[in-house]
């Protein structure tokens, strides 16, 4: 498990960069200046952060936690904080309330109230790339109003509180237009460009209807069932098992199981398992300890030719 202690007690721009004030399991280092800092987590990746306005910090996230199922965060907050998460690749989840977990994936945008989320985060695919914008609404509100007079961050914060503390916007062209360009910016104009795009995003929020959004949360029991199903599917890659059998084994309807699994992992059950098998086979091939015939059997293919065809279609080579 990967532990992070978050300490955001004083001024936003002074102390948000102490996000990793105490990190267990891995060493880390922080380098940079007043406007840009790199939080290097070694083998686990890095955060690249930019101080945009008073109370607003942008962070680009690139982490790899293949050997850690969960990230536990202990936070200390003295201000009203909004978090805006955009997923470029991978999947991310965190707890909301006592028995809800929300998941989002590639292209999705999630806005949440920080102190209404709990301490456990999950990265189902073992990696995550994206960006996160931290907004101290009390510190940033007057400044943002200079540029967007009709948009009030505090009112927006209170609106989210009435909507379970979060809202999720699935990937769409509008989000891609506003957010997508942030990942590819000439170094000479980065800071100015990030400021403009941040204001554009808030302007987009000012005309977006957040009153109705889909139910995207799962209960902790549903998440546990999905995790148990995943473990069963990968612990014996040679076995053949149907969705009906899985549903019966875990006391859940077939339809609910399929929906829950896709929410967590972003793909239908057996598409996910097929890709897992082929990724595992790729590692075995690279290891050089087994023949193709042996590997095909280890990942559940009845013949080397069927395995070779599937591998070629997925990986692009044999």
Feature locations, PLM:
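Conserved hydrophobic/aromatic pocket- or pore-lining residues that grip, position, or stack substrates
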Residues: 194, 233, 257
């Amino acid at each position: 498990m990967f532990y992070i202690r978050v300490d955001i007690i004083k001024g936003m721009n002074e102390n948000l960069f102490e996000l990793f004030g105490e990190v267990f399991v891995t060493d880390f280092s922080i380098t940079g200046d007043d406007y840009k800092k790199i939080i290097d987590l070694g083998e686990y990746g890095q955060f690249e952060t930019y101080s945009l306005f008073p109370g607003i910090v942008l962070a680009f996230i690139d982490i790899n936690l293949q050997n850690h199922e969960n990230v536990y965060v202990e936070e200390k907050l003295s201000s009203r904080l909004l978090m805006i998460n955009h997923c470029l690749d991978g999947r991310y989840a965190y707890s909301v309330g006592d028995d809800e977990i929300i998941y989002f994936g590639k292209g999705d945008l999630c806005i949440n109230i920080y102190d209404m989320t709990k301490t456990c985060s999950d990265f189902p695919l073992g990696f995550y790339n994206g960006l996160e914008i931290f907004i101290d609404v009390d510190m940033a509100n007057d400044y943002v109003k200079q540029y967007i007079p009709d948009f009030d961050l505090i009112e927006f914060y209170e609106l989210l509180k009435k909507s379970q503390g979060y809202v999720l916007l699935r990937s769409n062209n509008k989000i891609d237009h506003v957010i997508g360009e942030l990942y590819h910016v000439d170094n000479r104009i980065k800071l100015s460009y990030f400021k403009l795009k941040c204001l554009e995003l808030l302007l987009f929020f000012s005309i977006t209807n957040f009153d109705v959004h889909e139910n995207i949360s799962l209960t902790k029991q549903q998440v546990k069932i999905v995790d148990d199903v995943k473990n069963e599917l990968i612990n014996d890659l040679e076995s053949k098992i149907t969705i009906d059998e899985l549903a019966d084994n875990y006391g859940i309807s077939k339809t609910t199981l399929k929906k829950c699994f896709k929410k967590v992992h972003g793909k239908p059950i057996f598409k996910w398992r097929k890709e897992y098998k082929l990724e595992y086979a790729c590692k075995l091939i690279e290891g050089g300890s087994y023949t193709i015939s042996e590997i095909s059997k280890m990942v559940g293919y009845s013949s080397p030719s069927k395995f070779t065809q599937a591998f070629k279609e997925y990986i692009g080579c044999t």
